[in-house]
């Protein structure tokens, strides 16, 4: 029987994809492109919505990562460290809005989270056998390409940011499925 700690990541993925896509769709301005965090920081109601999504989904992913994936995978310490970078970055991004005096700190924690996401995907590639490892390599390379695009094409940042986040979610789901 599969333990209950297997399922929260699937719920988190559904919520995250739905809620973050909705936020981007409703608030994105083609004339003034922004990151998800910058869009959320424009209004208090959007910031609250963004915080709830990050905290809830991050915590649901944490349940699956710490209590299902980490105990079953090769290199559990490295996986736990990479996940912790992602999780702490995620929680911190929700606290520090992407505006004004806090913008530089927000950017630092966003980069910490991105490093955690990308590291996790590559570690899954190394730690998972067969087809699952191959899928993780595809996710890792696609995420790397998106990071390069985010760094070089700031005008379309949000269009690279969302797939990067969703590929990270997919990477976690593949790892959970491989370890069930």
Predicted feature locations:
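N-terminal topogenic module of multi-pass integral membrane proteins
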Residues: 1-68
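Hydrophobic core of alpha-helical transmembrane segments in multi-pass integral membrane proteins
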Residues: 11-22, 62-65, 120, 135-150
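C-terminal ends of transmembrane alpha-helices
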Residues: 23-31, 88-103, 142-159, 177
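Short juxtamembrane and helix-loop transition motifs at transmembrane-helix boundaries
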Residues: 37-47, 67-75, 94-102, 122-130, ...
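Small-residue-rich segments of transmembrane alpha-helices in multi-pass membrane proteins
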Residues: 42-45, 108-122, 164-178
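Transmembrane helix-loop-helix
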Residues: 63-87, 124-145
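Membrane-proximal helix-loop-helix units in multi-pass membrane proteins
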Residues: 83-132
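Terminal transmembrane helical module of multi-pass membrane proteins
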Residues: 125-180
């Amino acid at each position: 029987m599969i333990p209950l700690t297997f399922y929260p990541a699937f719920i988190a993925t559904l919520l995250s994809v739905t809620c973050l896509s909705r936020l981007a769709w409703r608030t994105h301005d083609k004339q003034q492109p922004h990151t998800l965090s910058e869009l959320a920081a424009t209004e208090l109601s959007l910031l609250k919505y963004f915080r709830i999504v990050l905290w809830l989904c991050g915590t649901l992913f944490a349940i699956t990562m710490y209590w299902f994936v980490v105990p079953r995978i090769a290199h559990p310490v490295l996986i736990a460290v990479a996940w912790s970078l992602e999780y702490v970055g995620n929680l911190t991004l929700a606290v520090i809005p992407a505006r004004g005096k806090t913008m530089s700190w927000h950017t630092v924690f966003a980069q910490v989270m991105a490093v955690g996401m990308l590291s996790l995907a590559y570690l899954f590639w190394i730690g998972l056998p067969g087809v699952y490892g191959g899928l993780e390599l595809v996710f890792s390379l696609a995420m790397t390409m998106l990071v390069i695009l985010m760094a070089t094409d700031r005008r379309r940042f949000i269009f690279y940011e969302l797939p990067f986040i969703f590929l990270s979610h997919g990477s976690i789901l593949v790892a959970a499925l491989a370890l069930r």
